[in-house]
């Protein structure tokens, strides 16, 4: 887990015991997700999107393929992840921690997304991250790992090398309400 939490080569492209075991670009892999986000949130050319914890930014790439004039930004803590982004997306990415204040004004983005990132923060770090997503986005969508029962909790604890906040879905919802989050959210489960 220590090696995985560095979020560098070993996490993304090293041995499977440290993370993804080879998170490679596959043309079109993220296209259905990109299209769904564009459709659900009514994005168009000129809209602004921020991806918090973008990793290799493959989703931003697919969104920009569908809407070439979409204004994208993304950040991650991983130098390796950012360096592996598609060339046309790299200029829009920077290294930053999700739990630190974001260098953007209020409501800068038409959509802020964070997929599979926030559960990697410690509980005391979540408040700033969630409040910043709320602050800079007109629309927001967060996806985290959660659990609904003991089996899913066990599976999540066994699988998640980097998760610091392993929470029941009711706890996530409580936190979102407590932090003033008004956006959309979703959970993934390990059944």
Regions found by a protein language model. Name each.
Residues 113:
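A conserved beta-strand element that flanks and buttresses the S-adenosyl-L-methionine
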Residues 1-41, 45-105, 121-135, 139-191:
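Class I (Rossmann-like) S-adenosyl-L-methionine-dependent methyltransferase catalytic domain
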Residues 116-120:
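Short catalytic micro-motifs in class I SAM-dependent methyltransferases
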């Amino acid at each position: 887990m220590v090696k995985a939490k560095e979020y560098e080569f070993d996490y993304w492209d090293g041995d499977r015991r440290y993370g993804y075991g080879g998170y490679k670009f596959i043309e079109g892999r993220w296209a259905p997700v990109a299209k769904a986000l564009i459709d659900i949130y009514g994005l168009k050319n000129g809209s602004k999107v921020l991806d918090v914890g973008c990793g290799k930014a493959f989703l931003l790439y697919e969104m920009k393929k569908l809407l070439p004039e979409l204004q994208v930004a993304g950040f991650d803590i991983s130098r390796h992840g950012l360096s592996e982004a598609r060339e046309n997306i790299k200029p829009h990415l920077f290294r930053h921690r999700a739990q630190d204040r974001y260098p953007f004004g209020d409501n800068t983005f038409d959509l802020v997304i964070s997929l599979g990132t926030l559960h990697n923060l410690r509980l005391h770090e979540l408040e700033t991250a969630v409040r910043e997503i709320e602050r800079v986005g007109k629309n927001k969508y967060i996806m985290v790992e959660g659990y609904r029962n003991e089996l899913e909790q066990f599976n999540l604890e066994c699988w998640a090398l980097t998760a610091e906040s392993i929470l029941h879905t009711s706890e996530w919802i409580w936190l979102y309400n407590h932090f003033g989050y008004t956006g959309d959210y979703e959970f993934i489960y390990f059944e």
